[in-house]
Amino acid sequence: MTNERKEVSEAPVNFGANLGLMLDLYDDFLQDPSSVPEDLQVLFSTIKRVMRLIDNIRQYGHLKADIYPVNPPKRKHVPKLEIEDFDLDQQTLEGISAGIVSDHFADIYDNAYEAILRMEKRYKGPIAFEYTHINNNTERGWLKRRIETPYKVTLNNNEKRALFKQLAYVEGFEKYLHKNFVGAKRFSIEGVDALVPMLQRTITIAAKEGIKNIQIGMAHRGRLNVLTHVLEKPYEMMISEFMHTDPMKFLPEDGSLQLTAGWTGDVKYHLGGIKTTDSYGTMQRIALANNPSHLEIVAPVVEGRTRAAQDDTQRAGAPTTDHHKAMPIIIHGDAAYPGQGINFETMNLGNLKGYSTGGSLHIITNNRIGFTTEPIDARSTTYSTDVAKGYDVPIFHVNADDVEATIEAIDIAMEFRKEFHKDVVIDLVGYRRFGHNEMDEPSITNPVPYQNIRKHDSVEYVFGKKLVNEGVISEDEMHSFIEQVQKELRQAHDKINKADKMDNPDMEKPAELALPLQADEQSFTFDHLKEINDALLTYPDGFNILKKLNKVLEKRHEPFNKEDGLVDWAQAEQLAFATILQDGTPIRLTGQDSERGTFSHRHAVLHDEQTGETYTPLHHVPDQKATFDIHNSPLSEAAVVGFEYGYNVENKKSFNIWEAQYGDFANMSQMIFDNFLFSSRSKWGERSGLTLFLPHAYEGQGPEHSSARLERFLQLAAENNCTVVNLSSSSNYFHLLRAQAASLDSEQMRPLVVMSPKSLLRNKTVAKPIDEFTSGGFEPILTESYQADKVTKVILATGKMFIDLKEALAKNPDESVLLVAIERLYPFPEEEIEALLAQLPKLEEVSWVQEEPKNQGAWLYVYPYVKVLVADKYDLSYHGRIQRAAPAEGDGEIHKLVQNKIIENALKNN
C-alpha cells in the first residue's frame, strides 16, 4: 500500500461500504489517472493535492512559525504551504470531510477547510513542531494527534498572576544585580527568562507523577537565576557572593538547601546545589550539578547522576532500574549544542541498556548568538537542534516571549517522555539582552541585531501588558509587583555586613585527606576464597561454554588445588570483586569490550556458544549483598567517563570503574579528568571515588597503543586528590581494589588511577600464590629478598618496566642490585623508600628506570622526591627513552632494541 493510499484508507472520506473498491481505484489512479472515470479523477486529484498540502504543513510549517521575539531570520526557499499553492480553494475544501486532513479531526471540524485553518494556526504559531523525521510510527502518530487536537494551556487568573510574579522575580533579580554590581559577571538570563517558569512547570509535573529526583545540568547563562528561583538559594547568599562576604551565614537552617564548597572554591556561576521540598505529596530532591566553563560537558555527568538515582544496587545480581524515580533536565546553549561533540556522545547513550535514563528533557536557551558569533558562522544547519534529529526525538521550537506557549511545550514534552521514555528537545528561542557577559559591548560586533534588541520589551512587560489587557491585573498591580521584587532584594542586601570579608588565604585541604589511601587489612580464610572461586566457576545446567575458553577458566581452580598454582591478574580481580560484593559495596564496570576484556582476560560475562544466552558469575556470589553491573560501552570516552563520574557522585557507595580499551584513548576524556575528577573536591567539595583502568605498557605496538599518558595524571595529582598506581603483583591488585572499595562513601574517598597491564595479565611473575590474598594489605612498594650489606645499587621502577628488569636480572643474578617496585606513584611513597635506603650501608647509586620517554612517564614527577631522598649521599641516574614528541616507536623490532638497551644500561653496576 502506498503512503498516499494509506492516508486515504485511514481517513473517513464518506466512501462507506465502497471503501475497498475506492482504494483499489485510487491505486489505479496513482498509476494512471486516465484509468478511472472522470469524476473520480477530479476527486482523487483534489484529495492528492490536499494530502500534499497537509504533509507540507506538518513537515515545513515550522519554517513559517512565529517563534522569533526579535530579529526573525530571512528564510529562503520555504516550501509551499498555502492553500492556493495547491490549486485549492475554500469552496472545494468545505466540500471535503475534515477526516481527510487527519482521522482525529473527523469529529471536531465540519470540513477540510476548517481543519486546515486549524493546522496552519497550529504549525505556524508560537510553537514550531518537528517530528516527521521520527521513524517510529507509533511515536509519530501520537505526536501528530497530540499537536493537532485542540489544546491550550488553561491557566486561571490566579495562576496567571503567579506566573507574572515569577517573571517579575526573574527579571527583577537581574535588574537589581545590573544596577548594584555594575560590570560584575553574572551571565544574565534576560531574553530567555521563560526558562525559570519552564523548569518550575517541569518539576511540578514530575511531582504530580511521583518523580522524586530531578537532576539539572546547565552552563553559566542564567544559572544564578535558576539557583535563586528554582533551588531557592536565598537572595542574601547570592548578594553576599557578589560582595565577597561569607554566604553560608544565610544558608536555610531547615536543611532544605544543601550546598558544598571546596577549599579553593569557584566562581558563583559554576556552583550548584540540592533543594529538598515536599510538592504535591512527593518529597523531591532537585539537584543542580556543579559545572565548569567547558560548555555542555556536564551533560553526561547529569545522566550518570540520574541513572544512579534510578538504580537499586542493594541486592544480589544486577541492579534493577526504575526510570520513574528520577529524570534529567539538560540546558544547552544554541551555539554550544551543535558545536560540542559531547552532546552527540551523550544522546547516543539515551537508549542503551547500561546508560538509559528513561528520557532526558533538553532545553536550548537559544539567544541566537555565541559570544560574538552569529548562527551563520556557528552552524551548517537551519536550527541548532537539527543535530538531534538523528536520534529520532521530537523537537519543539518555542517563542520565549510567549510564556503560555513555553508552558505548553513543557506539557507536551513531559507527556511524550512519560509515554515513550525518550528524550525531547525544546528550543527556547529568545535573545540576549546584553553582551556575553555584562562587561562586554555587543554592538561592536553585532550592531544591527542589538539596535532591535534594545528597543524590544522584556517578557515581564510583554506578559504583564497581556494580563492588563485581559483584565487579570491592573496597570498599578503590574508595577506594584515589579517594585515589590526590588524592595525584597534591597532588604536582603541590607542584611549583609560589608566588613564581613572572607579570609582564607591558606585554603587548606581537609584533614581527612592528609593521609594516602589506607590499606584494607581484612583477612580471608583459604576456604572462604575457595568457596567464592568455586561459585564463580559454576554455571547453569546445560550452559555451553566455548571449549577453548573453558580450559582457560578451569585453570582458575589451580591456586586452590595445586601447590604451585598462581592467581593471575584477572582471577585476582574476580576474587576482589566477589569479596567487595559480600561486603555490601555495589560494583559498576563499563568500557569498550569490558565484559570480556580488551585482551580476552576478564570473561565476566559468558556466552553460550549454541544459544548466545549470557551468564554473569558475579551475579551469583555466595552471601552477595550488593549488585554487580558490567556493560560494554559505546565507542565513546568523554561521555562514558562523565557518566560514571556522575553516577559515583550521586551514589558514593558504588564502586564505579571505567576501563579504557587502551590507556592511550583515555585522553579523549581529558576534560572530565581536568575539570571534574581531579579538581571537583577542591573547587566544589564534590567527592568522587571513580576508578580508572588504563592499559599501559610498551610492547612494540606503536605510539597509540603504548601509553596512557601517566605523566598527565601525575601532573593533576596534588593535595591527596587521587591515588595513581602501576602494579607488578596480582595480590597487590587484589588488596588495592579492596582498599578503594573500603574508602567509598567516606571523607577519605578519592579517584583511583590504575595503569593496568596488557602482556602482564598472563605473566607468571605477576601472578601470586593464594596465601598472599588471605591476609595483608596494599603495599606502596615491593622488593625481593636481599642482603643489605651487598646492595650498592637500587633501581626504582614501576609496572611492566619492573617486571622486565626482574626477569632480566633473574637470568644474570647480581646481589649488588636491588630492584624496587614503586607500586603507588601518587602519593609518592617517600617514607617507605627512605626507610629502605637507610637499611643499605653500602649503597652508592639510586636509579630511576622507565619505559617512557624522559619528558613523559613518571620521571619529571618523581625527580624532586628522589632528589631529596638521595641528597648528597648517593648518585642519582635515569634510564629510559630519550625525550620524544611521540610516546613510542612505530616498529616492533626497533622497540625491542630500545627496550633491551634500557634494561642493559640500567642493570650495569658501575
Curated annotation (Swiss-Prot):
It catalyses: N(6)-[(R)-lipoyl]-L-lysyl-[protein] + 2-oxoglutarate + H(+) = N(6)-[(R)-S(8)-succinyldihydrolipoyl]-L-lysyl-[protein] + CO2. GO terms for biological process: glycolytic process; tricarboxylic acid cycle. InterPro entries: 2oxoglutarate_DH_E1 (IPR011603), 2oxoglutarate_DH_E1_bac (IPR023784), DH_E1 (IPR001017), KGD_C_sf (IPR042179), ODO-1/KGD_C (IPR031717), THDP-binding (IPR029061), Transketolase-like_Pyr-bd (IPR005475). Its EC number is 1.2.4.2. Its cofactor is thiamine diphosphate. One of its GO terms (cellular component) is cytosol. One of its GO terms (molecular function) is oxoglutarate dehydrogenase (succinyl-transferring) activity. It comes from the Bacteria. Homodimer. Part of the 2-oxoglutarate dehydrogenase (OGDH) complex composed of E1 (2-oxoglutarate dehydrogenase), E2 (dihydrolipoamide succinyltransferase) and E3 (dihydrolipoamide dehydrogenase); the complex contains multiple copies of the three enzymatic components (E1, E2 and E3). Belongs to the alpha-ketoglutarate dehydrogenase family. This is 2-oxoglutarate dehydrogenase E1 component. It comes from Staphylococcus aureus (strain N315). The gene is odhA.
